[in-house]
A protein has these predicted regions:
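A "functional boundary" signal
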Residues: 1-205
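Alpha-helical transmembrane signal-anchor helices
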Residues: 201-231
């Protein structure tokens, strides 16, 4: 991430054509967002949130307000500002647009689930529904949305839902999905990590719940690192 930021900081966006400048600001936001997810120090995390917000403002100043990309970045800005209800409203507006393709609609459902998670336990069920719908639509479109399945599994693990026993099944589907649709390097990495984690905990039946949580977290970290996560 530091290397990516150094490269971005070496570029003067004002010297780029407008379309490339938009891309520059979006890449900058993505890099900052990735860094905040890996950063435990609140001081540095806040610093990169501020940087992401600054680039969001720069992007919004260039994009037309009636474009779906404008609304997408605006929703992300609301999310960073912890204005979660506005973020939810904007994402729902995006989903109703005719120019939003089905696979993007599935991604927006996933983001919606993430925002609902920020609102606390009272919204956990709504978040679970959004993740589930996102996963279903994604599978219908024959595309991978592994994090949706993993989040569903993790939510089920930590709930008294009558379907909690399906948590490991969701995680299994996510891993197998990676094996089928991912490139060989990514698939092998996810699969070996997953089965290694299971193996070292196999004899600890009483720790089954904890095992699944570790598996979900480890696989999630690898997927984020490998670029599956955006929002």
């Amino acid at each position: 991430t530091h290397e990516s930021l150094s490269i971005l900081e070496s570029i003067d966006p004002d010297k780029l054509p407008v379309e490339l400048r938009k891309t520059y600001y979006k890449v900058y936001m993505h890099v900052c967002h990735s860094y905040t997810k890996l950063q435990n120090d609140s001081h540095y995390r806040d610093k990169y949130i501020e940087l992401a917000l600054r680039n969001a403002d720069s992007y919004l100043a260039l994009e037309r307000g009636d474009e779906s990309e404008y609304l997408s970045v605006q929703a992300y800005k609301f999310y960073l500002e912890k204005n979660y209800q506005q973020a939810i409203n904007t994402i729902k507006t995006l989903q109703k647009r005719d120019d939003v393709k089905p696979y993007l609609s599935a991604e927006y459902l996933y983001y919606l689930g993430l925002v609902y998670l920020e609102l606390g336990d009272n919204y956990k069920r709504v978040s679970l529904e959004a993740f589930t719908r996102s996963a279903i639509i994604s599978n219908e479109l024959a595309m991978t949305n592994l994090l949706s399945l993993l989040y569903v599994g993790r939510l089920l693990i930590n709930s008294n839902n009558p379907y909690a026993h399906m948590a490991d099944e969701y995680i299994n589907v996510a891993v197998e999905d990676a094996v089928i649709f991912g490139d060989s390097y990514r698939a092998d990495l996810i699969k070996s990590t997953y089965y290694y984690t299971l193996q070292i905990n196999l004899e600890r039946a009483e720790a089954r719940k904890k095992t699944l949580e570790i598996v979900a977290v480890v696989v999630s970290i690898f997927l984020v690192t490998l670029g599956f996560c955006l929002f």
